[in-house]
């Protein structure tokens, strides 16, 4: 049995809590927690603490995070991600220089309004659930820190840039 950490890949379409429940059934442990929440439509590594290791979760939650993400230029959706309905579009696509140089403007302490389709809880309910029900959710800006932000690739033909960031909790 024991006390340990597991790094699980969380695919798109499943909540962090559901992944924890699946792992509980597989390994037969009831004391499992996750270090942070990935939105349902996000994919990536979700650290799971088992047994007494759950006492260390807060240390990992407060640690710096790294993400790789893509941005599609020229399209705005109602959800802020690829799953939403397109609500606006523009023909303007930034230049390669603009895509790469904009990064420095975001380094440091900034205020971020989380997207309405996020896993943040509003009165005990995930914001994305309220948004899918058509309820208007106003999320308050949060202080976050971006330690590093780099453009890794820019596909001008498809208007997609891929970025790397190192940040405090609560960024994406």
From Swiss-Prot:
Keywords: Isomerase, tRNA processing. Signal peptide: none annotated. It comes from the Bacteria. Its EC number is 5.4.99.25. GO terms for biological process: mRNA pseudouridine synthesis; tRNA modification. The keyword Isomerase applies. InterPro entries: PsdUridine_synth_cat_dom_sf, PsdUridine_synth_N, tRNA_psdUridine_synth_TruB. GO terms for molecular function: RNA binding; tRNA pseudouridine(55) synthase activity. It catalyses: uridine(55) in tRNA = pseudouridine(55) in tRNA. The active site is at residue 39. Belongs to the pseudouridine synthase TruB family. Type 1 subfamily. Responsible for synthesis of pseudouridine from uracil-55 in the psi GC loop of transfer RNAs. This is Putative tRNA pseudouridine synthase B. It comes from Rickettsia prowazekii (strain Madrid E). The lineage of its organism: Bacteria, Pseudomonadati, Pseudomonadota, Alphaproteobacteria, Rickettsiales.
């Amino acid at each position: 049995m024991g006390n340990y950490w597991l790094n699980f890949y969380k695919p798109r379409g499943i909540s962090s809590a559901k992944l924890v429940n699946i792992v509980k059934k597989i390994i037969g442990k009831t004391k499992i927690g996750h270090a942070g929440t990935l939105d349902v439509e996000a994919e990536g590594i979700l650290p799971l603490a088992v047994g007494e290791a759950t006492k260390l979760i807060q240390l990992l939650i407060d640690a710096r995070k790294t993400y790789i993400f893509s941005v599609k230029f020229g399209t705005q959706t109602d959800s802020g991600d690829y799953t939403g309905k397109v609500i606006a579009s523009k023909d303007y696509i930034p230049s390669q220089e603009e895509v790469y140089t904009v990064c420095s403007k975001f380094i440091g302490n900034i205020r971020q309004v989380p997207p309405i389709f996020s896993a943040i809880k509003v009165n005990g309910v995930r914001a994305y659930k309220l948004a899918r029900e058509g309820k208007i959710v106003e999320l308050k800006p949060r202080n976050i820190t971006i330690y590093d932000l780099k453009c890794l690739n820019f596909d001008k033909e498809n208007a997609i840039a891929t970025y790397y960031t190192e940040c405090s909790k609560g960024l994406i």
